[in-house]
Amino acid sequence: MAGGIEITFEPLSSRGTGGDLVVFVGDDLALSGAASEALGQPGTELVARAAASERFKGKAQSALVLPAPAGVEADRLVVIGLGSEKDRAKIDWTVLGGFTAGKVGARSARVVIDGLGFAASARDVADFTLGARLRSYRFDQYKTKKKDEDEAGAALTLRVADPSAVEAAARSAEAVAEGVILARNLVNEPPNVLYPEEYARRVSELTQLGVEVEILDVARMKEIGMGALLAVAQGSAREPRVVIMRWNGADDAAEPPLALIGKGVVFDSGGVSIKSAGGMEDMKGDMGGSAAVVGTLHALASRKAKANVIGAIGIVENMPDGAAYRPSDIVTSLSGQTIEVINTDAEGRLVLADVLWHVQATYKPKAMIDLATLTGAIIVALGQDIAGLFSNDDALSGQITAAGEAAGEKVWRMPLIPAFDKAIDSKFADMKNTGGRHGGAATAAAFLKRYVNDVPWAHLDIAGVGMSSTPSEINRSWGAGWGVRLLDRLVREHYER
């Protein structure tokens, strides 16, 4: 039961008692045949009178909530507007599901989905369930006092023309919801609970779904030469981990995989270049990129995706102590390239550098996508509703952009020009880990690009969308779980065979 909500299906002709009865109307307030039957004459007349008195016009994402009259199979009537015919032609079913779940709350409801000049496909209904599950998510396990409604679980019964025709798509959507919820849970966890070793242990539970999991400890990282990642970790009492997840779902096991790489800084104090106190508590979410990768692997394995996908995350804690790495240190990365440390708070790119190099050298992927809450500069550039995309490949960039648009997780492609690469040249090493005040998101991407060889690659800077992002109809959580829906859509459309 993903998202704390139970969802079932029944035919349009079904009848029931109690709970909410949800119907949809356009801006003409016309009811579909099935909705009229469910409401009966008393309910239909009440809706017409109430709409007139409340000036309810059926606009998109508007609602009218009424006590049900005698003779109607419900305790409440919830009438949700879908807007004009033009609005109804471009319904975002995921958002509609979230909006509906928000109006129902922690109650049981029957939702009549049909008519109004459109046919809801199995995919539409599945997207509706996805939105409802994501809206119903709560992270409250550390609260000792809960409201009664927090203890209750919502239950939606969707009335559709053919229940059996939508169940397979709905199961796939539930797998995606579970992946998003896992990612949200990971981001929301406090860092004293989700330290690197514990994070790696939780990821190892994906083996129950058929995912192969390998954990690299400090000894192994030293053996292969992950000097950049280890430098970041050396100020923490908690040892770092690198976790490799392998989902081999393609018919051809030898087919090169898609590789997803995530930054997993479970807490970022800034290290010796320490952050200011205000807002530092949010730095538990500096592992949002890794959470998206873990959530995506969970989703792909749960729905048995026909694709080979590698997930790799570098998990560290960036802390200041007597052993911490310092500005002016020079560290040697796994690639052999040397890095002059200018700012210890630019640590995520050091973590990603070693993981990117390890993945491309070991697994020979057909493409690599990394996700990271990497820079505050991307928030200045794009705000908190869209992620920054940097890429060395137009085709991959286009696929990611289209998948994000379809999934409701939008990206905007940013430039990668030689000037950004030149900005990270160092007098003392092969490169430095910051490029100055200007173009911070772009110079960070240019740094990562130095760890990518001849393979299509994209970098998603999700600092604005991964945590504390704008609330929406499908997300009221601090940790958004951003990226799981985009990556699942990308795999579904371009990598499954």
Swiss-Prot record:
Disulfide bond annotation, renumbered to this chain: none
Keyword RNA-binding set for record: no
Keywords: Aminopeptidase, Cytoplasm, Hydrolase, Manganese, Metal-binding, Protease
Documented EC number(s): 3.4.11.1, 3.4.11.10
Alphabetical list of InterPro entries matching this protein: Leucine_aapep/pepB (IPR011356), Macro_dom-like (IPR043472), Peptidase_M17_C (IPR000819), Peptidase_M17_leu_NH2_pept (IPR023042), Peptidase_M17_N (IPR008283)
Binding site for Mn(2+) 1: 268, 345, 347
Gene3D superfamilies recorded: Leucine Aminopeptidase, subunit E, domain 1, Zn peptidases
Cofactors (names): Mn(2+)
Enzyme class: hydrolase
Positions of Mn(2+) 2 binding: 263, 268, 286, 347
Molecular function terms from GO: manganese ion binding; metalloaminopeptidase activity
GO cellular component: cytoplasm
Keyword Phosphoprotein: no
The reaction(s) this protein catalyses: Release of an N-terminal amino acid, Xaa-|-Yaa-, in which Xaa is preferably Leu, but may be other amino acids including Pro although not Arg or Lys, and Yaa may be Pro. Amino acid amides and methyl esters are also readily hydrolyzed, but rates on arylamides are exceedingly low; Release of an N-terminal amino acid, preferentially leucine, but not glutamic or aspartic acids
GO BP terms in the entry: proteolysis
NCBIfam families assigned: PRK00913.1-4, PRK00913.2-2, PRK00913.2-4
Entry's family note: Belongs to the peptidase M17 family.
Protein name in UniProt: Probable cytosol aminopeptidase
